[in-house]
Amino acid sequence: MHFAVSGKSGDRVVFDHAEVLDKDGNFYTANMRSAKNLIEYTLRGGEKEEFEPTFTFQGFRYIRLIEYPGDISLDDFKAYPMHTDYKKTAEFECSDSDLNQLYKNVLWGQDDNFVDVPTDCPQRDERQGWTGDAQVFIKTAAINRNVGALFNKWLRDAALEQPGSGEIMMIVPRMAGENNGAAWGDAITICPTEIYRAYGDKTILADRFKSMERWVEYIKAQGENPYLWNTGHQFGDWLGLDAEEGSYEGKTDKFLIATAYYAVSCHNTAMAAEILGYTEKAKYYNDLYKNIKAAFADEYLNEDGTVKQQTQTANALVLYFDLTDNKTAVAADLAKLVEDNGKAMTTGFVGTPYIIYALSDNGYASLAYDLVLRREFPSWLYSVSMGATTIWEHWDGLKPDGSMWSEKMNSFNHYAYGAVASWFFTDICGIKYAAPGYKAFEIKPVLDERLSFANAAIDTMYGKIRSQWRKVDGGAEFEIEVPSNTTCRFEYNGTKHAFGSGIYKFTVCA
């Protein structure tokens, strides 16, 4: 916040910051916990003075003037957004204004939290580089902005803090505590992999490969069975809505989650080894991955490949992480769980980023749309209906009557659940990379009767990719843009085309 003020020497300007107002319209700071978010400035006197904080930042929508000399003019106060200096690389718009607002909220949440470090929140007494938040959001982050340099630096910090055991801290830079855990520490393999896929630069894989290896070997050494991760501290499906009363941990078996992520990290490490030409290491990690996958099946799947524990998160992870040979049955189980819950999610930090993909990739795109377009709690659009401008930590952080979910853990600027926005590009508009950096890509849009048009663009290393569709009588009209030196495969409703660079307009019959 920048302000101008006139007064005599010794006069003071004092104000604090808040994200929301309470149900009576009062300034609300309880969710800041011990953070004061207070600015105090003492005037030297004489000419008009201007000031803005240099060594701190705040996450806020409102300020409250506690002391101020003279008359107050809004013209003397200006709020400036602060974030890492990176390039905007995406656009999205559709016929649903609430969905458009949700995407804007995702962007604000990302920018507000990407200030040199990807923090969980920018306002309360935390503001820390939680690895779990970063990894669930990385796919969306890399679409919205060019985050290659930011994550290269942050992952280097993670590697520097990696102890001899190979574990990855839950917070980078390390702030407190010794705990790590699945889905959090796995940022060291997931983030480099997604950065490589988005930008096509294998340098980040080369730079982080040793850390990826050490993390996988750390997990392997944790229990008696080297192919299961079933020991130690785990966050589980954090903030899952199926948690027991008084708990933040969702119902899904935390060791199912841990072993699923163990498989993913091993698979990512094997892939990195192949890309980097490390033939023997690639074979070692591919073999290890197969053994982990087999052990996972023995421990957590039924003989027919369905999941023993029937939760939304368990089924979503098994589908998205390709841990079953019977995706048809697992997808049907997931769909039934969602349907039986009133077409609403019970997932937390771990399950939420994947449930939409788990449905739409396996024949339930309409149900995925049901979740994305749902307005009632729990849903992404509930917060939009409550006037949100960023992504909330809790689905019902602010309740319909204006009361708060909690004072202890109730951030209104927590970007992790904004991971859903990648689906706007990959499925609503259908842009999916088929080769690193989008050297080759697909456009396979998934239309729904509740949207009449959608338009998305991604600025890749080769130029702009655009996918735009609009419903017309008898079918849908498409406009796609293919950048130079790339190839595109288009598919919709049985129609298939292959395109080189250029701009194309055509109609596909229903």
PLM regions and their residue ranges:
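The feature captures the catalytic groove of carbohydrate-active enzymes
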Residues: Y28-A30, K36-I39, G45, T119-C121, ...
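Non-catalytic C-terminal accessory modules of carbohydrate-active enzymes
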Residues: K23-D24, S366-A510
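Extracellular/oxidizing-compartment recognition motifs
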Residues: M1-R124, G132-D133, A149-N152, A158, ...
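Acidic, mature catalytic/reactive cores of soluble proteins
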Residues: S9-K23, P81, E93, F209-A221, ...
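Structural helix-adjacent loops and short alpha-helical linkers that scaffold large soluble proteins
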Residues: Y68-D76, L99, A142-L155, Q162, ...
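Alpha-helical support elements that line or immediately flank enzyme active sites
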Residues: M1-E19, I66, T131-E161, P192-K202, ...
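Helix-terminus loop motifs that line ligand-binding clefts
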Residues: K23-K36, R145-S247, E376-G402
